[in-house]
Amino acid sequence: MRLNTLSPAAGAKSAAKRVGRGIGSGTGKTCGRGHKGQKSRSGGGVRVGFEGGQMPLKIRLPKFGFTSRRALVTAEVRISELAKVNGDVVDLNALKDANLVTRNIQFAKIVLSGTIERPVTVKGLKVTKGARAAIEAAGGKIEE
């Protein structure tokens, strides 16, 4: 095999459709767009979700729910990731310093996923029941 003999596999590349090149090509004159109408025009076509004037499904269905603004600034931290935190005290600033959460995060919750070997003190963070049990089993403690 040489660089000058490399080529795509047979049938892997199809030739571009050449339109407007005569009747015999199959895509002459109207170029496969048919006659007249919105879709035949340059830049023609309908927007996404348009149903021809019928009330669209998106509008027929009721609104529901909302986007919690608190959820945007809340993060989950796995218990196994606490090993990356320097020191024995884990708080929001320690998580930010260890790059476990981004700078805009204001609230964090520690969840049970993985294991923890060293004892740590968790301050000012929410902790799930399972994570609380695992931290205390490792000799750590949780301070509200």
Swiss-Prot record:
Question: Record's SUPFAM superfamilies?
Answer: Ribosomal proteins L15p and L18e
Name its GO BP terms in alphabetical order: translation
> Has the keyword Ribonucleoprotein been applied to this entry?
yes
Q: Which domain of life is it from?
A: Bacteria
The record's listing under NCBIfam families reads:
rplO_bact (TIGR01071)
Q: Which family does it belong to?
A: Belongs to the universal ribosomal protein uL15 family.
**Per its record, how is this protein called by name?**
Large ribosomal subunit protein uL15
Which organism does this record belong to? Shewanella sediminis (strain HAW-EB3)
